[in-house]
Amino acid sequence: MDIIVLAGGLSTERDVSFKTGSMVASALKENGHRVILLDVFMGYSDKEENLDGIFDRADEISVKVDDIPEVAPDLAAVKASRKDQSPCFFGPNVIRMCQMADIVFMALHGENGENGKLQAAFDLLGVKYTGSDYLSSAIAMNKGMAKQLFLSLIHI
């Protein structure tokens, strides 16, 4: 399978996400899959017309985890280092690359990867992904609502 492991993003848990993503990507590669570890915020800045055969160049395209500091990220510095300087959640070519994959493995940590918004976008775009659907993610992220829902199920 051709798999995008989506990690990073603009979260205080950016570094943890890359560690998770790196381990997942390694395990998937060991099992014969073609895998790209992709930073959802930084994206891949090659021209869109050069995306053909991206999974043949997976090692070249993947985020180099050794370059990621093991300390809490300076999110202002991360924003400033994005080539296109866009504030958009998705970096260059992220959506297109995810659409080209057989599935996207969600290795994002923090609100933006777990609150259901990304899952809803992928549902609308027809992108297959791992984990909970958008509604389940949104409910689980709201701890008060999740607690009420679970307590109501006890009495059924």
Q: Which residues does each PLM region occupy?
A:
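Conserved small/polar residues in nucleotide/adenosyl-binding loops
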Residues: 154-156
